[in-house]
């Protein structure tokens, strides 16, 4: 541009881009970086990876159930062979997902009867449009953020001839089991304005957090409205978890302000995302440990501490995004709330007396600090990975060191059952031969789902009904146990990985031990 043009003071020559990169404040840059980091971790952040693990688990779980529910074996095997696009509507259905999870728990606990998933699935007609069974009942059919997932709105539910009536009955039972309250806790049927307000809040969330917003919304299957009660008073919102999988329920009053809608959707969908991520492995060896919470009267279980920390880190990023919201967002959606959106401290607690722990950052520091001081071995490798990831994201917005870094996961095998620590080592009688003479054999009755894009192998033991997730190293060693003796396994491992003989021997020995302890080798 010429000097003459500038001196003319013409509006065209002096116009500045709306959001020039060179004028962006450091705070906005930090939000952008943290937003991206929250979807980068392949185990906990990358929604596509989480989805693929859940699809593999759903597929192998259906095949496992077919082994123990022969009356519904054909439909269960058909489900186990279905492709991703066919499985997702079933996996996202709250009634079917609840039945599936309940049946897996029965298998893991040694129960071999009373299954419900196969019975329900066998009575549901095929749906060429790709809608889940419960979704077919919704009238009118509304998808509030069709660009970011297949969530639908709980409107009037009419089974008609589309699905068995018992499906509607079961959905209502799951709803009733998710919230407290009497007759006033009936679902609130939303009108067009409520549905539009919900979609508007979702648009705001994805505008504030263009990476996290679409990611977490993709883990929601259904959004309903209610005026139920909770232990802390009128229900504001909840995420279904095990009782009502993939579902969010919220009070209609939360739709009055799009910023509140965005925060509510973030809050509950973050929980649903972690729920899905945790299907692929445990975080703790002692999840029931009691933890004092200064802003609450009642201690929390340790697993709840991790879930809360996961949410509060996301909330930190969201609140920073709100504080730095672009003028065009404020013009479209109005002024954001002046204060920080965080649930209030319980009266009578230490925090209430001291005026502390009223912000998300204070709570992140406390929860992360407590976890960092847990005894060694309390966190599984996946738990340590979660803590490292959350710590790295927090450091972008809160550079003050407040936790000891979680120790890095030791390199080596990972063959841990999903719901329990590894089984005891095989009896000595099965391992009389010396390590150089023994021929490791794979246990019979193992189902498999390879996931080469992730370097993982999912196995299901039809005898013990446990699931095992193997990393790339353990997968390779397991695959080489095809009748070779240990020296041959070590030699082939060294050839394929390019490691020297001592390192190969160390890796293979550790993997074999873990695979034996998990019951996958004899």
Regions found by a protein language model. Name each.
Residues 255-264, 272-303:
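Post-HEXXH active-site segment of zinc metalloproteases
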Residues 6, 18-21, 77-78, 85-111, ...:
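Long, charge-rich, low-complexity alpha-helical segments
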